Amino acid sequence: LRGRTEANNAEAQYAYSRLGKDVSYDIVNAGCIAYMAIFDKPATIALEWRKMYYRFKQGVPLFYHCSRGCDRVGTLTLLIEGVLGVSENDLCLDYELSSFCGKDGLRHRNERYLHPDYDFEAVMRTIKSYPGETLRDKFEYYLVRVCGVSASEIEAFRKGMIVPDVHWRPERPKR
């Protein structure tokens, strides 16, 4: 583990990672970049993509988390998985699982941290409104045309992340 990013809208509380000196440590100190706020902050999303992509190109694993919950990191993960072509059903399931819902199906939040744009369904509707034949194309449109991420970076990321398992062989029937 050589890379760590913490999504945080407070001032930097730490200058280093608790995981050790050999772990690079970044704080996403950009306020709310969750849900609908991503459409207001394309430069911030592009910056976070570039940090992640830089580590990817170096072959460095990246551990990232939110300091107060899951909304900001869940939204960034949605963008990453979306551009990789994860199905809409799986995108929604991953996002739902990251919410650690209570028995009533709702994640209880501190009222102090509520944001009026906390609407996952609205994010998906907005992404789906972009041009493209597939949901993956629509996520790519958002990252490339709205945020200014390089299409070649996205393609290289896909090629590196979606690798067929060349060692897998179908099980042969026993004779």
Regions found by a protein language model. Name each.
Residues L1-F63, T75-R175:
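Cys-dependent protein tyrosine phosphatase-like superfamily
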Residues R68-V73:
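Ser/Thr-glycine-rich phosphate-binding loops at phosphate-binding pockets of nucleotides
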